[in-house]
Amino acid sequence: VVVENFSPGTIARLGFGWDAIHARCPKVVMASISGFGQTGPGAGRTAYDLVVQGMGGIMSVTGTADGMPTKYGVPIGDIGAGMFAAYAIAAALVRRGTTGEGQYIDVSMLGGQIALLTYQAASYLATGEAPKAAGNAHSIITPYDAFPTKDGYVIVAVGNDSLYQKFCAALGMSEAATDPRFATNRDRVANKAAMYEHINTAMAPLTTAEIVERLDVVGVPCGPISRVDEVFANEQVQFTKQRRTIQ
């Protein structure tokens, strides 16, 4: 397997392009990772993570509706290209095991960002309307958002009507549980602002930990918004050894 991320055309000029390597070793799997692809009108452009996040649409759906477009907190443009290259290499190796043939793989940072648009891209392709940033909320499921608590914020992901009833019971929201405006997810989406008033009132006197404890008991997906130090202090993270010291 050969992996390279020179500017398009560079490795061929050095004598190690696909044609040269494949001629010597027909079984070779070669992956080229670049900003915009090996061919096409934009192939020669220079890419950095932030540039590709902007061009790939990710920033347009990240952040709040009334704020400026926002980049991910990690270099998802770089990471995405590497991940997709790894998947493609693994698939090429499986194919080689069957056919005995090598394969050339062209992965771009821009292409990776487009693939990560997932349902945002599907929504546009189905409706013709470009999705907009919506903060932490889900576009078609609610309550699915970050809510303020007595000492911070809590994430709640109420994915169906059954979970909504459990959510209301855990937080003592009996009125919201029976209000016909919130009976189904479609109703809740249509009356989101009114529902949020009930949720904010119920959560205001409770700490994040208290809310998580209540919702965990009834099986409602939830969690705190952790700082990086809090992530590594989490007992599940420690148990699964996500942090390891290598000698």
Q: Language-model segments: which ranges?
A:
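A structured beta-alpha segment of the ubiquitous adenosine-cofactor-binding alpha/beta core
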Residues: 1-23, 204
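Residue-level detector of anion-binding/catalytic polar loops
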Residues: 1-2, 27, 221
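Hydrophobic residues in well-ordered beta-strands that form the structural core
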Residues: 4, 30-32, 224
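Conserved beta-strand edge residues that scaffold enzyme active sites
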Residues: 9-10, 35-36, 229-230
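Active-site-adjacent "lid/gating" segments in soluble enzymes
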Residues: 13-154, 158-159
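Short secondary-structure transition/capping segments
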Residues: 16-17, 43-44, 188-192, 234-239
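Aromatic-enriched alpha-helical interface/lid elements that frame and gate functional surfaces
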Residues: 142-218, 222
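A glycine-rich dinucleotide-binding beta-alpha-beta segment and adjacent secondary-structure elements
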Residues: 217-247
